[in-house]
């Protein structure tokens, strides 16, 4: 796609072709740039952010406050208040007073969405020209579920993500986590090369 509107139209057409009602999304900064969530909603598709921070701010109808930790500005009390307001089936006596309980609440809701999604939409940390693979890096594992569970997977990435070969991808992966969060490697690093081919094991 040459412009944002073209990218949105292509994604919308794919969703329409499979009669998609729900799209699970792993974190995609380019998705923010082209306002893909707004486009999908206007076209009758429910986009669900699956990164925990992105999910929280989506419920609050706020933009991300930070590129890596999008809900860093919120207290656990604000997150609990958001869940009470948006998770309408939440029992009134359910205690939401610590991060682990909040995580469990979000995980339960997101699992339902992962299992019912028609389309998964991901970004790509790298596009490997040598193999046609995408590299996905997360600390939550949500990208793997967005890629692997729905029957259709759409990758939204721009040209600067292309690297020549796997060796280059591995070199950049070592730098990526350190520069973003100070980790040696992120918890989940996945390479996806499309559906199984006849010469795969």
Locate the predicted segments by residue.
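The feature marks the mature, well-folded catalytic cores of soluble enzymes
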Residues: 1-201
């Amino acid at each position: 796609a040459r412009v944002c509107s073209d990218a949105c139209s292509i994604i919308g057409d794919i969703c329409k072709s499979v009669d998609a009602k729900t799209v699970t999304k792993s974190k995609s900064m380019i998705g923010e740039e082209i306002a893909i969530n707004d486009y999908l909603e206007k076209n009758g598709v429910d986009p669900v952010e699956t990164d925990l921070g992105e999910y929280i701010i989506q419920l609050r109808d706020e933009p991300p406050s930070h590129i890596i930790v999008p809900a860093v500005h919120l207290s656990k009390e604000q997150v609990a208040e958001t869940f009470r307001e948006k998770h309408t089936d939440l029992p009134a006596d359910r205690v939401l007073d610590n991060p682990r309980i909040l995580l469990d609440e979000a995980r339960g809701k997101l699992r339902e969405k992962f299992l019912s999604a028609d389309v998964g939409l991901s970004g790509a940390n790298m596009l490997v020209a040598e193999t046609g693979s995408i590299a996905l890096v997360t600390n939550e594992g949500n990208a793997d579920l967005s890629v692997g569970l729905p029957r259709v997977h759409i990758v939204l990435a721009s040209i600067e993500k292309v690297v020549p070969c796997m060796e280059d991808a591995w070199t950049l992966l070592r730098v990526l986590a350190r520069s973003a969060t100070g980790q040696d490697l992120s918890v989940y690093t996945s390479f996806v090369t499309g559906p199984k081919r006849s010469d795969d094991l």
